[in-house]
């Protein structure tokens, strides 16, 4: 039997008021302490290069310190726990159809927090609570419709947290991040970089969508923590360019990407590009048997007719069905739960 008390950890860490109305209707600029203008990736292509250079100059303030990756390599931080948390964030992002930026911001908040503050445990309930709080904050920054704190806890969570516990964790995250939530991300660069390769804009949609997929598919891998958002965006665009026969012959990642904007590092872009290519090969190797198995299941399923009146089948797959609570462990400020 393991006893969890959040009050000792959170009360010592948070010195804010208990007035939780702060999280109900504030403007997103309040969280960042900066301008409330929303710099979406779709607008980046129309900005001059010096504006993008300003993002490159500022991105260092929105990433963990340079030794963060080494903490996973030395196992002072649990890489598998981080990977599980990121995987859960991506599942919830897909479940609620959140923007890719929301998921990326949630992971960014989590990494910056873990760099600056040590959790009472490197895995288990502390990491899950942190992931829920970071995703909630990211959704409040970017989404129009935000689920309740209870409804965030879907997609295979092991513990259920009370709303007041999550809110206090949100305050702790805000405090540790100095309320700087308007982070610089790869999505601030990909449209601009795509135009550098394809000035006509013919393949712009293809570039943005596929680069976004590459970025999110690699976000679980701790090795990418070595690279800043601009390098990740440039490397992703180069990977996409090599998928297009009309562009792959003229795109050389070893020659041109650092000329797209002042402040880019050729060495980091090339290294990140190589890592993405290696990860793509590895993922294809691991996923091929699963894809074949799924295709076989689909073929078998398609040969079986399902009666329209089969209400039990419908109700079991309905996303609106009531969630069962018996498989979860409740965790609150003054309660204990066994692990």
From Swiss-Prot:
Keyword Glycosyltransferase part of the UniProt annotation: no
SUPFAM superfamilies (alphabetical): Cyclin-like, Multiheme cytochromes
Alphabetical keyword list: Cell cycle, Cell division, Cyclin
Keyword flag Ion transport: no
Expressing tissues: Expressed in roots, leaves and flowers.
Alphabetized SMART domains for the sequence: CYCLIN, Cyclin_C
Function as written in the Swiss-Prot or TrEMBL entry: May activate cell cycle in the root apical meristem (RAM) and promote embryonic root (radicle) protrusion.
Subunit comment: Interacts with CDKA-1 and KRP6/ICK4.
Designated name of the protein: Cyclin-D1-1
Organism this protein belongs to: Arabidopsis thaliana
